[in-house]
Amino acid sequence: MKIDIVSVFPEYFEVLNLSLLGKAQEKGLVEVTAHNLRDWTHDVHHSVDDTPVGGGAGMVMKPEVWSECLDELLHLEPTTVTCDSMVTCDSTADADDTASADAAEPAESATEIAANADTVPATDRPVLIFPNPSAPLFTQQDATELSHANHLLFGCGRYEGYDARIPQYYRAQGVDVREYSIGDYVLNGGEVAVSVMLEAITRLLPGFMGNAASIVEESYTGENALLEHRQYTKPADWRGIKVPDVLLSGDHAKVDRFRRDEALAKTNELRPDLIEALDCSKLDKADRKTLMALGWEVSGAHPRQR
């Protein structure tokens, strides 16, 4: 996978040379290049921003600089967008369209990720990604989909963000443009968000993890996603706190059931919206019993609280 990152602080991404992502680069699984957006400026101050049209606080990143950079990295010739090819500049419409498209994609199970990652066809079409706190939330499903791409290009915004016409223009050129939020909060720039998305995406690549099965039971993973059960290691009794006896029983069926029940209970407490999204037809008898004890009705298509 080829990964390009555009930022006014490219040195921020030196951290990507550490840990598993650094090893993945050494093995040739991923090629990461961080570019300085100021390299595409032409003024003495290397300016990348200007005041907002219509007034307001802060500065907005200029489309001229971004377009020269992105045209070069995407191997595109500059052009003028016509009315026929113009896409809406309404951010709500764009977000709704993106969310609808994401919702239409079926979630891939964790087992399929681990077992069939080598057989999933990759796409040669580059994907241009901008972090944006006003965009749809980046999810594990998005990470799974993007892990099948051959080329990802991330643009890191700063100040009040980037000119809204930048993603608009490249969508009109047929580029697959994604805008994602990583949570209901605002950062100083897109670098942190890009690092988060990169780690979520690249760890799903075949050969990235030492044990591919380790991603199977993680939180948010799979078709009927739950939060992961709690994890313990040795010693079994630490400072007076003991691990649950069932985990020491050696009975794998009981251990699996305990962990499943704990995942259901934890998800019920912290993320009941994930319980509501479960497919009741894929719950076994023990799942149903646990959910009913937690106050859920499981006779319909999806659980609902009593």
Swiss-Prot record:
What keywords would UniProt list here? Cytoplasm, Methyltransferase, S-adenosyl-L-methionine, Transferase, tRNA processing
The keyword Cytoplasm appears for this protein: yes
Q: Which reaction does it catalyse?
A: guanosine(37) in tRNA + S-adenosyl-L-methionine = N(1)-methylguanosine(37) in tRNA + S-adenosyl-L-homocysteine + H(+)
Principal localization reads cytoplasm
The UniProt annotation places S-adenosyl-L-methionine binding at 157, 182-187
Short name of one Pfam family for this protein?
A: tRNA_m1G_MT
Q: What quaternary structure, including any partners, is listed in this protein's UniProt entry?
A: Homodimer.
Q: What is this protein called?
A: tRNA (guanine-N(1)-)-methyltransferase
Q: Which organism is it from?
A: Bifidobacterium adolescentis (strain ATCC 15703 / DSM 20083 / NCTC 11814 / E194a)
Q: Which gene encodes it?
A: trmD
